[in-house]
Every structure is written in structure tokens, then in C-alpha cells.
A protein has these predicted regions:
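Vicinal oxygen chelate
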Residues: 1-26, 36-58, 70-71
Length: 71
């Protein structure tokens, strides 16, 4: 099972640019330590925020994907 959350930017003033990195996909994982270890091994972690308990990985095209703990 998974849940995909989409955001509708109704009043966004210009055409959506996938390269903005301001808007991104977020995935929740049941085991943050296990996911972090895997992503660290793959070398795809591009930003970490330990205070918030999240981190970001970069896909092959350079787009960021947020990894958050399952709640």
C-alpha cells in the first residue's frame, strides 16, 4: 500500500517548472533507519534535516524526493 499526495497550485503565477526544487514528492517509510542506511549506501542523499527527522534523496535527473517517517 502507498499514498500519493498531490498539490494543486491553482494561483501559481507562471508555468510550473520541474527544476524549481521548491515543489517535490515526499514518501513515507515505516523504518527511517533502514531507509536511510539504504539511501546512504546508494549515495543518493542530497540533504538532511535531523531536527525535523527528514532527509531528501536525489533521483537520476536531480529532482529531490523527501523521505519522512510513517506516522
Amino acid at each position: 500500500d502507498f499514498r500519493l499526495e498531490l498539490t494543486w497550485l491553482r494561483d501559481h503565477p507562471q508555468k510550473y517548472d520541474l527544476g524549481e526544487c521548491e515543489f517535490h514528492l515526499a514518501l513515507s517509510v515505516p523504518d527511517m533507519d533502514k531507509a536511510h542506511a539504504l539511501h546512504e549506501k546508494l549515495g543518493c542523499i542530497c540533504y538532511e534535516n535531523p531536527a525535523m527527522g527528514i532527509y531528501f534523496i536525489s533521483d537520476p535527473d536531480g529532482y529531490w524526493i523527501e523521505i519522512v517517517p510513517e506516522r
